[in-house]
């Protein structure tokens, strides 16, 4: 990897709202230091199936992760597996479903909330399980991972946008 990658997944954020409201990120895009992509959503349009789809490239119907209650390790190779196999450092500050898909399932908070294990696909992680976990805390978690481990691939997955959309 020539450059480290930070993937920010803003579940539930409309593309046009993102283009309008995320001026700081748009400045990075304009400077050629970031990218903004409009994705065509796979079906079903549910969170866990789409996390699996984004991180593996495999459609939900093919991965078997077809609803939010499928709680098991993925049977697909994810970006975490490819990065780890290439000797790269991986990290995530994300909802616990990501940990369940790629590290261990079921998620056990005392064991899995703070992950620091080079043998796991997601080697370093801070995982949360409350939908209303503050985004400010999540971004602080991500920055801690970035500073401490300098990951080549870091997923940042805040939940407050999606949580607000369900209320």
Predicted segments — roles?
Residues 10-13, 83, 159:
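DG-centered beta-turn motif at the end of beta-strands
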Residues 13, 61, 161-164:
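A short, flexible beta-alpha/helix-coil linker loop
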